Amino acid sequence: MSCKVLEELEEVIRRRIEEGNPESYTYRLYSSGIPHIARKVGEEAVEAAVAAIAEGRERLAEEAADLLYHLLVLLNAAGLSLRDVCNVLEKRRK
C-alpha cells in the first residue's frame, strides 16, 4: 500500500517541526503537546463522521484529509511514523 502524498505530507510536517517557526500551524500544534493534538484528532474524526452522514462525499473527503493531517502530527509527536502504522497493517493482513 502506498500513498505518495501522505509520505510527502509527513516529510513537510517533520520539516516544519524542525524549523520551529512559531508562525507555522504545524509547529504550534506540535508544540501544544500530545493531549491537545489528540483532542484535535478527535474533533476532526467527529467532523468526518458528520460529513459522511450529512454533508456528502466531497465534504467527507475534505474532512478525511484534515483528519489524516492531524493524525500524522500526532504520530510524529508520539515518535511514530506512517511507516510504523503501515507495518502494523501489513502484519494484520497476513
From Swiss-Prot:
Pathway: Amino-acid biosynthesis; L-histidine biosynthesis; L-histidine from 5-phospho-alpha-D-ribose 1-diphosphate: step 2/9. SUPFAM superfamilies: all-alpha NTP pyrophosphatases. Pfam families: PRA-PH. The keyword Amino-acid biosynthesis applies. It catalyses: 1-(5-phospho-beta-D-ribosyl)-ATP + H2O = 1-(5-phospho-beta-D-ribosyl)-5'-AMP + diphosphate + H(+). Gene3D superfamilies: MazG-like (1.10.287.1080). It comes from the Archaea. Its EC number is 3.6.1.31. Belongs to the PRA-PH family. This is Phosphoribosyl-ATP pyrophosphatase. The gene is hisE.
